[in-house]
Amino acid sequence: TKGIQLTNLNFNALGKQIIATNPMFRPGDKMLAVMPMFHGFGLGVSIHSMLVNGGCCILVPRFTPDSYAKLLLKYRCNLIAGVPTLYEALLRLPKMKNADLSCLKGVYSGGDSLSVELKKRFDQFLFDHHATIQVREGYGLTECVTASCLTPYHISREGSIGIPFPDTYYKIVEHGTQKEVPYGTEGEICLSGPTVMMGYLHHPEETAQTLQTHEDGLTWVHTGDLGYMDPDGFVYFRQRLKRMIVTSGYNVYPSQMENIFDAHELVQMSCVIGVPDKLKMQKVKAFVMLKPGVPANEETKAVLMTYIRKNVAKYALPYDIEFRSELPKTLVGKVAYRVLEEEELKKLSETAQEQ
């Protein structure tokens, strides 16, 4: 674990960027702040950016879908921000069935990949409940406080995480180099701007790897994330390099696989991981949470495998689909894929000992 050194300037620059990208904001607007204050998303966006611009924060001391919905409806909050699992939970909540959400001016998703299918469903949910907005997906990392890129107001492109904040610059480079790649070409996402950290506390080597001065004289954060940019400046996040699965020499992107699973009518949510394999290096495994009432049996598994075969390359096919009633979550509500990876490693270790 590394400590990230952030400054007052970093936080205040973020506050100005948030307002610049949200022209509908007015002093007195209320943010329902569910993200923890130890997280850049919670402290930087939900609290600091609101308070310095005259907004109001409604804190959620202990999150449950019911308590969140109760506060949202009681205080008629104008802005909500959270990870995708929050919006999935709201869709399933009976209390929200007849809710009037015309009070909402902004709905923001970050901290984890928002599937195309979930965005479509929640956008429709907002429309059906009298909101005149859509989910705006963002991207960022703690090395720049939190968000540094956001879908523009009332404009979106499928699969895009938006455009950079004012005074923040993005480029895509060949991984391991500073060489910029053409539009539409996948590479490592790099960013530069006033919210970039001072460095990692007491880790000069890691700081030098992440913060690099390019030929333009600017300091760039090498994020370790794969993505690309289109000619209009819209950025597309592909996958964190650390999560990428390499099977038989081919790259498999878990977030892409999860998007495909989540688009199926039987699936509520999914998580795809790589499991060590002697022959392939890694093999693909999917964990699936089914929609209420769908039986977790071999017939359902066969239906999903048939569907997946039609939508992915042969090398990306999962060797197994495991059904779960719930998927593990981190403290900020993201799907805890590392927990699933550790479970699989433990199984492999136990099997090896038995042999």
Residue ranges and their predicted role:
Residues 77-82, 91-160, 169:
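Gly/Ser/Thr-rich phosphate-binding loop
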Residues 163-167, 177-212, 252:
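Conserved ATP/PPi-binding loop(s) of AMP-dependent carboxylate-activating enzymes
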